[in-house]
């Protein structure tokens, strides 16, 4: 049993199972229908350590090149699970449910997802148009309602979560998509009690017209659930909608609202260098998880080769060579690697003295009982010096820097005070407690 009998510094912090954080790390990817061979996709997913992939019925056919078997093979070879969505403009709920059952029976299904950004890709559902340039979103609302009901009425699928559409903040009429379930007296066009989803879904890209430049706390602020966030975040989609200012949840409810991100990321351009992109994406997964996002999917695994525009979002270049983002994430997931289960995470007594607003922490625990305290900085320039104090004298402490590699950069014995110099990336402190 792990014990910490030493001097109490503060209220001990309960850890989160390392696997729970690793399971949150997802990605958007091209597949054979967009010219990316499955074998290369498997190779890239494995290297980075992704645990889930955002997917759906767009581009899916019985004849291929992308079939249900493509996704089953991806799951079998990498262990990833799949969020399964209607994607852009899709309306075929029957196909979504049918193919989702195949994935579920193989253990490959993570969740169902509603339409992708209906403000950009409208739908025609049961003869009614909605979203896009239409004046009403009623068709979008009815489609999402029916998707939810179809999943929850199926005995195989009922326990799988349904994620909302993305961009409900763009609604042109108040059909209530800013709620998971429309509450009483909400004064929406759809009736009170209409249920759309189990999780809110946002596309909170780190760089946004209201926040276009690199800055301190860039990913931390993008994950902010309050009105202080200057990107397309939770508040502007489920608090007060950004387009027509329809009222959604109060802040105290937003703080605990189950939520996911199915698209975020950054492309390389101007002041956003390959190095900064790599740091942003690594910090992003940490900030999202710490601030309540159960799952986060970054756009994009590899740069698109079948469309124009800025194609430098990828962890990989078009020639399949890894950018720094891929290398840094590989190092982080390798350092944290854990495939075991931890029924009840323990608690660690620690404090960070002189902690500025650009320094954040996340306490994890592996299935073998080892604590992994991740402390990261989000400074654009300069450094912060902090001291991590432990309430007990651990047997050994190892410090890892994922921007350098996977091996420890420092090992300490019988040390309960750790000096850190932080700038723009995480340090993983692996703490091996004394056993008795």
Regions found by a protein language model. Name each.
Residues 41-43, 52-109, 131-165:
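Aromatic-lined substrate-binding rim segments of carbohydrate-active enzymes
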């Amino acid at each position: 049993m792990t014990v910490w009998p030493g001097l109490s510094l503060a209220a001990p912090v309960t850890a989160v199972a390392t696997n729970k954080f690793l399971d949150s790390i997802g990605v958007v990817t091209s597949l054979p229908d967009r010219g990316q061979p499955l074998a290369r996709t498997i190779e890239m997913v494995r290297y980075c350590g992704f645990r889930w992939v955002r997917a759906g019925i767009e581009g899916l056919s019985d004849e291929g090149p992308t079939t249900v078997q493509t996704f089953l093979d991806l799951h079998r070879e990498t262990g990833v699970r799949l969020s399964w969505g209607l994607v852009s403009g899709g309306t075929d709920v029957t196909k979504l449910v049918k193919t989702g059952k195949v994935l579920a029976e193989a253990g490959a299904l993570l969740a169902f997802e509603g339409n992708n950004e209906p403000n950009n890709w409208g739908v025609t559902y049961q003869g009614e148009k909605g979203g896009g340039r239409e004046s009403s979103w009623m068709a979008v609302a009815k489609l999402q309602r029916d998707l939810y009901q179809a999943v929850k009425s199926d005995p195989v699928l009922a326990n799988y979560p349904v994620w909302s559409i993305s961009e409900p903040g763009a609604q042109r009429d108040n059909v209530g998509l800013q709620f998971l379930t429309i509450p009483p007296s909400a004064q929406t066009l759809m009736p009170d009690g209409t249920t759309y989803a189990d999780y809110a879904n946002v596309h909170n890209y780190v760089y946004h017209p209201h926040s276009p430049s690199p800055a301190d706390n860039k990913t931390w602020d993008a994950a902010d659930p309050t009105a202080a966030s200057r990107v397309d975040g939770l508040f502007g989609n489920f608090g007060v909608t950004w387009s027509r200012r329809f009222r959604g949840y109060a802040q105290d409810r937003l703080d605990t609202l189950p939520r996911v991100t199915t698209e975020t990321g950054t492309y390389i351009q101007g002041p956003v260098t390959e190095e900064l992109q790599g740091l942003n994406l690594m910090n992003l997964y940490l900030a999202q998880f710490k601030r309540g996002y159960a799952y986060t999917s970054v756009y994009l695994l590899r740069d698109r080769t079948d469309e124009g525009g800025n194609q430098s979002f990828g962890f990989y270049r078009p020639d399949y060579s890894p950018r720094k983002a891929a290398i840094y994430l590989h190092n982080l997931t390798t350092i944290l690697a854990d495939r075991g289960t931890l029924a009840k995470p323990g608690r660690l007594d620690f404090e960070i003295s002189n902690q500025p607003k650009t320094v954040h922490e996340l306490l994890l625990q592996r299935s073998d009982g080892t604590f992994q305290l991740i402390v990261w900085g989000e400074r654009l320039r300069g450094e912060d010096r902090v001291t991590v104090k432990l309430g007990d004298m651990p047997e050994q402490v190892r410090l890892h820097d994922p921007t350098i590699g996977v091996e420890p950069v420092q090992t300490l014995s019988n040390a309960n005070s750790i000096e850190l110099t932080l700038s723009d990336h995480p340090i993983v402190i692996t703490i091996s407690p004394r056993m008795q």
